[in-house]
Amino acid sequence: MLHFTITTLTPLHVALGIMGIVRSQQGEEFAALPAMVLRHVDEGNREPVRLPILPGSSLKGAVRAMAEAISPSCVPVADPRVRALLGKHNRCNDVQALCPACRLFGSSGYAGHVSIGDIMFARGDLRRHKSPLLWKPGRDSAFASRYARQGRLQGRKFYVHRSPAEGDDVRVVIKSGASASGRIVYAGGRREELGLLVAALGADPDHPFPIKIGGGKPVGLGSVLINIDRVVILEHTSVEKFLRHTGRLGGVINSEQLEAGLDVAGESAAQWLREQIQLARRTGVLLDDPYQQLREILARDGLQKTAPSGPY
């Protein structure tokens, strides 16, 4: 189990996809996309409050995309034009011969080994943010000229970090500088693939970098930094008994009744993480060149520049 802290470096926007109304302090009303799923939390004798959350599924999807890019993994896409260009990287279809990313995060007929719980932020972390208007991604006849070269995909697209641009599109966001804690359960997988997971989180103690989550990435939103504070390895028999009883890997996240075989924090945790990443590199699960390229694309010093303003 990995205990981590996530800190927003720019405003974070994860929408429900429906329009909501936001009222300013002056009484003006704006149509805005709700930024976060809001969860009712019972605080004992007080009235339940609604707290903004980052769904674990959103973080898991973002991390999977990076894990696929820095490992010898398939590209599970639906667009037939993309599939025709993938060659050996086409979607896995045999559960006995899955790529590292599919083993980690799951595939059709295979549950995977990673479960990430929802991350709750504080009620006061919500803000209203105005960013440039974004058009839908280009999927027209120019697709091949932008993304393919000599009948093969040029690579994967990742957005660099930028300071947010200003515009007329009102969004509800989690403010920059907000922090929250979360847990990741990794059960039954290979150690080298755990090293791949840590690298994809941007949590390599020697090469940390922020990742991007949610909407508004082109205009500077969604930059977050993840730091793994504590590593807990649970006794196998204890976890096996729990899973037999509940049938839910995610339930391990909130259980306090499992025995720990290893519980380290601080520099001890950092050293343990280094060992997993080194194992991933030695076994070829973590590819050095793509990993270096991803770190350069997502370098934190990109935040010193501002994203372009105006319609995208």
What residues fall within each predicted segment?
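RNA-binding basic/glycine-rich loop and surface signature characteristic of RAMP-family CRISPR effectors
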Residues: 1-312
